[in-house]
Amino acid sequence: MRRFFLIYLLLLICFSFKAQFQFNFNDSIEVYRTNTALKYPWAGGLNYAQFSEIDYDYDGDMDLIVFDRSNDQMRVFEQKIEGGVSFYKLNPLAYLEFPEQIRYRVISIDYNGDGKNDLFTYGIGGIKVFKNVGSPQIGLQWELAKDLLYSDYTGANLNLYVSSSDIPAIVDVDFDGDIDILTFHISGEYLQYHQNQSQELYGHSDSLIFKLKNECWGGFREDVNTNFLILNDITLPCTTGNVPNPGIKPNTSSVDKAHSGSTVLALDYDGSGVMDVVIGDVAFSNMNLLINGGTAPNTNSLMISSDPAFPSNSTPIAINLFPAAYFVDVDFDGKKDLLVAPNAKNVSENEKSICKYKNTGTQSTANFVFETKAFLQQDMIEHGTGSAPFLVDIDNDGLKDLFVSNFYAYKPTLNKESRIAYYKNTGTLNNPKFTLIDSDFINLSTLNYGFKISPSFGDLDNDGKIDILLGLENGTLVFYKNNSSSSSLIFAPPVLNYTDNLGAVISAGQYATPQLFDLDNDGKLDLIVGKKTGELMYYKNIGSLSTPQFQLTNPMLGNIDVSTLTPDGYPTPHFFRVQDTTYLLLGASDGFIRFYDAIDNALSIGNSFNLRDADFLSLSKAIGGYSSCAVADLDGDNKLNLFVGQDLGGLFHLEHDENSNLGIHTEIIPTQNIECFPVPANKSLTIRLELIGDKLFIYNLIGQKIDELILNQGTNDLDLQNYSNGIYFFQFINTGITRKISVKTD
C-alpha cells in the first residue's frame, strides 16, 4: 500500500519574492536491508537519543518523543492501531509543535496532575519547564511555566543545579503526587533529593517549589576518578543525610572534584515501595543498579546493593559512551521497557546506539531482557553522523541507485571511520525501491582516507561507465575508474592527488566535497569543489569528453561563503537543472539548505548567485547540522524527489508537489507588512495588508487546503464561525509569507 504523509512544507521566503515551493514528506519508497523492509527508512537517523512519552495527538494513547542532543532535534512517533495491532508511525513535522528553546535534554512528565505530560528541559545552570496547555481542539500548545527551577538550599533559594551534560531523575520520589528531582551535586559525588513542596504547602501538585531534603540520598558516594559506588558512605554529608548539614555546600566544589557528568533513572525496580536508581557515568559504558533497602519513602533509607553489570540477568549494558536509561513502554504490552542510549555528543556510538531491554516481568517488578542494540535505528537508513545522499545509475540498468556517505561512524577500536553505503535500485522506472548491497562500498573505510569522504559521480572517460571522484579530509581528490563488466561493479586502483590541467594537485585545503556537473552547459562535466572554509571552487573542463582537463576558473564561485558562526562551513553542493535552468541546493555544517538561482550567467569571478532562500523549506531545525541534498525524478511522474542528509546519519525523502514550479517566479515585490489580530482568533479575524492586496490560502494541520480568498490592500475581516477549533496555516501567496493562527470559536 502506498504510504505517504500529505503534509505541505511552506517555503518562508526571506527576501519577499513572488515564489512558492511545496514538497511533501513522503515515505512511499521502500528500502530493504537483508530482505527486510525498513519501517522508518526516511526518519533521518538517530545518534544520542532520549526517550519520553506524550499524548501528542490527544487520542488517549501515549506517543513516543525521541529527542536527540546532537543538535536538539525532536522526533515524534505516533502510536497507531490497525487490525487491533499497535505500531509507531513517524510524524515528520511534529517537531514544529515543540518549544524552540529546548536544549540538551527533554523529560516529559505530568507535573500538575492535569493528565497532560509537560516538558522539563535545560535552563541555564538547571531546569526550564514548559506546561502543556494544549487540547484536542487546538492541538499541542506550550506555556513557559518556569524559566528556571529554584530550590531551598537550607535557607538559600538558589537555582536547582543540574549540569547541561546530566540527565536527572524527575519523578515522584516519595509517591505523594507531585514531582521531585534527584540530581548529582556539582561535585559529582552525591545524589541530592529535592522534594517538591506542592503537596506539603497546598495539598495539590501544580506548583514547582523545591526544597533540598537530602544531600546524600541513598547514603552512597561515587568515586571522583572512577564510577565505583561506595555504599553506606561514612563521610559527610552521607553520615547525617537529611539537611540541614554544614558538611557540604550547595553549589560549590573543590578544584579536584569537578563534576563531569551523570545520568539517573529512578524506578521502583523490585516493587518495594521505594525508588531504586540506575546510574550512568560520562567516562564509562556500563550502568549501575542500586537497590534501596527501605520500605517507605522519606525515611533516609540506604542503598544496600549494587549491580555494576546491570542487568546481570541478561546482556549487561555496554554502550560507548556515557549511557542513559529510560523507562518507557515501547512494545504496547502495558509494561515499561528499558531503553539505553549514549549521552556524550560526538564521542559515542552513533549508528547502533539504542539498546532495548524488554520487560518480561511486571509493571511493578521489572525484569529486563536484552532484545536489540539498534531500537528504531534498525528500521532506518542509518550511517552514523553527517549523512549525504547521491543519486546515480552506477550499474547502467536505467535506474538511479542511492549512495549515502557519512562524516563518520563510531568505531570502538579506532574511534571513528568514514564510509559510503550503496543501495541498489531494485525497483522499476515508475516504482523505485532501494536495497542495501554494501555498507562499506569498495572498502573505502580501510584506506585511511580520514573523515567525511565525499563522492562525486560521472563518466570522465566517455566509456559509458560512471566513474568516481572522491573528496578527502586532506582536501585532495581521488579518482576511481569504473572497469565494471555487465555482471559486477569493478573499479581500478585509486589514483591519488588528482590534478588540474596544469598538473597541479587539486586541493580544497581540507574536506573537499566535489560535484561533477556540466555547469557551463557545453556538454562536458565540470568540477565544483566545496572547501571546509565555506567557499566553492569552479574548475571548467577545457579538455574533451574522454580526456577531461579541469582548469580553475573561479576560486569563489557565486561569491558564496557559508561559514557562519565559525570559520568553517563544510559546503556540500548539489547543482541541478529544471527546464534548462540551473539551480543550486547547498548544504552546510550549520544544517541550513541554501537555495540559489540566477546561476547560468554568473560563473565568472566577481559574479554572485542569487540566494532565493537561506533555509530551504525551513528544514534546518529538523536537520540539525551537516545538511546535504540530492534531487531527481526517480519515478517518472515529473515530480522531483528530494533526499536530505543530516547529522543524525539518515535521510529525509520529500516529493515535489505537482502545483509547484521550481524557479519560474522571479518578480520582486515590495516588502509587505501583514497584521493578523486577534490571535488566538475567535469568531472573526482581521487581516491588515500595508501595501498591496494578496491571495490567501488556508490549510489545516494535515495540509488540506480548506479555503481560498482574495484580500484587498488595507483591512480585511474574515468570518471564522464555520471553522473548527484548532491550528491553521494562513499562506499569503504573493508575498510568500505564512502565519500560524489558532482559532477558538466556542
Regions found by a protein language model. Name each.
Residues M1-N24, I664-H665, Q704, I727-F729, ...:
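Bacterial Sec-dependent N-terminal signal peptides
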Residues R2-R3, K116, K452, K465, ...:
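Basic side chains
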Residues F5-L11, D61, I181, K524, ...:
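Acidic/proline-rich low-complexity IDRs
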Residues L6-I7, D333, T362, T428, ...:
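Short amphipathic alpha-helical "recognition" segments used for binding
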Residues Q20-I664:
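Beta-propeller-forming repeat regions
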Residues E667-D746:
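C-terminal outer-membrane/trafficking sorting elements
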